[in-house]
Amino acid sequence: MKTTDFAKHLTAFFTEYLIGERGVSPNTIRSYSESFSLLLNFLDEQVNIKADNLRLEHITRKTVLNFLDWLQDTKKSSNATRNQRLAALRSFCTYMQYEDVKRLEQWQEILSIKVKTHEKRSVNYLSIDGIKLLLAQIPINTKKGRRDLALISL
């Protein structure tokens, strides 16, 4: 089977760019890999493009927007998850701007897709009574207990 241009560039993106040049964490690799797996599933199920036929020309702004909508409508992804998937695709497009300059406009159109705002979780703090209760749980009749109380009290 002949390797498609998409497969060749995606492999290089992961092995040469992300791991070699950028030195990203294994968690980033895992997240980006999952994002592209979802994209391949979307293209197969919704657009009828199998992974072994996928070409760079298929990755357009419209396709990416439809993919992001599919994530939220079908997969019930939150805005934060949608933005995380978009970040993976944007990173790939940033890489592709230098690898495939004849499609520079295509990559820049995808890069112009905006992230959706999402509500950030507020940090809950312990109340004064909660702090007193927590500190009261530390046994102060031992050396380690007094040490622990001193450390936590700071």
Label every model-predicted segment.
Residues 1-154:
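Conserved catalytic core of the tyrosine transesterase superfamily
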